[in-house]
Every structure is written in C-alpha cells, then in structure tokens.
C-alpha cells in the first residue's frame, strides 16, 4: 500500500518484528545459535522516527514491546549517501520506501548515523562506498572481534 499512514507503518513493522522474535529469534538464542538479521529495531527508529517524524520515545517503547527487550549484540551499518545508493541500484525497480525520494532517504540516513553515535559500542559504521572486498573485510573484523570478546579464540 503506497498511501499507508506513518503510525500504521510503524505498528505493522512492529507486529512483524514481534512475530519474528517469537518464532525464530528467541528459539535460536535459546538453542545458543548466532542470529543474523538484515534489519531490526534500529530500522524502526530510522525510518519511522527520523524519516516519517514519529515520536522517538513512542517508537523505542514499541521496539521494547515487540522484542521483549532483546537488542542485537552487534549492528553493522553500511553507510552510503542516498545518491550513491540510487546510482548503484538504478537497474532495479525501486521499492515503496525508495520511491520516497532523496530527501526522505537522507533523513533515514541521518537517523541511522544518530543511532550509531548514541550506540557506538553496538553499532559499527562501515563505509559502503568502498570496494566490496573492503566492506567485507571491515564487517568480518567487527564480527570476529565480537566472537573473540564473547567466546574467546
């Protein structure tokens, strides 16, 4: 739905996240597995909070409710300007959020960067403007550091 209200978008995202947490994430963590997700609670703050202008405190409480307080141990933020991202993706058809335009994407980007500044111990920023090899190397360094910190060599 292209004309979805920001509040509805936030609540639907939270509902999907709550289901994901209950069905997949909690059981995996209970079985001592490492869980990797491509988006999680920070996306709500960046997209609905910074992008759509919804109240950040409301969104934080919504995140807490739908995740049961679970937070990622590590978040890798692949940082790129909206213009560069758009140029890279020019072959693909834009999704609903990409159709919002550069101004919206920049608000979301600034939201993610704000979260990274506020949560530097958890959110690691990687320049996605670098080569694929450099991005992968940086990501693996952060992942390996966390594994070493938690479980040793």
Where would I find each of the regions flagged by the language model?
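ATP-dependent small-molecule kinase phosphotransfer cores
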Residues: 1-67
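A glycine- and Lys/Arg-enriched "phosphate-lid" helix/loop adjacent to the NTP-binding pocket
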Residues: 39, 44-110
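NTP-dependent small-molecule kinase module
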Residues: 83-153
């Amino acid at each position: 739905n292209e004309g979805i209200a920001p509040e509805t978008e936030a609540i639907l995202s939270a509902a999907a996240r709550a289901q994901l947490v209950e069905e997949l994430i909690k059981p995996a963590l209970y079985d001592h597995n490492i869980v990797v997700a491509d988006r999680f609670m920070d996306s709500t703050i960046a997209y609905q909070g910074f992008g759509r202008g919804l109240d950040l405190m409301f969104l934080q409480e919504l995140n807490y409710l739908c995740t049961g307080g679970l937070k990622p141990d590590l978040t890798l933020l692949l940082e790129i300007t909206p213009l560069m991202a758009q140029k890279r993706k020019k072959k693909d058809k834009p999704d609903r959020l990409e159709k919002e335009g550069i101004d919206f994407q920049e608000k979301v980007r600034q939201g993610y960067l704000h979260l990274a500044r506020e949560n530097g111990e958890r959110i690691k920023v990687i320049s996605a403007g670098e080569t694929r090899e450099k991005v992968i190397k940086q990501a693996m360094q952060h992942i390996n550091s966390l594994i070493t910190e938690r479980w040793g060599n």
